[in-house]
Amino acid sequence: MCGRYSLFAPPEAVEQRFDATFDEPFQPRYNAAPRQSLPVVGDDRDGEIRTMEWGLVPPWADSREDGGFINARAETVADKPSFRDAFRQDGPGGRCLVLADGFYEWVESEGGKQPYRVTLADDRPFAMAVLWTPFEPA
């Protein structure tokens, strides 16, 4: 998954696209980053868009600073202890969709790295699959 993304589409467009409503006031994000509370649609299909902190904290962590993983490889997600339970849905946690209307990819240039925002051709909001676990200090 990318390390930065955006969601600043009109809230009505987001709600219509995902057939869900925000459970708290929508805050546009131009540069969403790990550890921020960001909008998601859960796998419970309750019709609510809620916020969750971006970054998976593994079950053995003593604090939020001990984790915050934002990338998992498809080849190993079912086996790595950090992601296994959420992926298999064995216990607390599971899957959800993080809502976005763009994400940033960085390209090396002479002056350093340059971010480029990637969107759908029609600029509609889209979703990215994520795994989540509740944080409970070990």
Regions found by a protein language model. Name each.
Residues 1-138:
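Short linear sequence motif anchored by a di-proline
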